[in-house]
Amino acid sequence: MSIPKWIVTDVKTSKSYELHLSFSNGKKGIFNFLSELQKPIYQQLNDLDFFLTAHVEDGTVVWNDELDIAPEYLYENSAF
């Protein structure tokens, strides 16, 4: 069984609310998070210091035990 291409293997954050992502298929992309900040679930990420704590866990980007984002969504909406 092959690993899905959209599994996140690494993330770096930027102060401009970008996620610089590496995926399991070797592609690297940039996901602009600014439009996501409008969504109620991501309101706490308006705190830049908290946004910058993003890390990879179980193949996707997470901030804490309650907040993550679907890796498929990141892959489909990243600029490559």
Model segments located where?
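Motif-centric detector for short Cys/His coordination patterns
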Residues: M1-F80
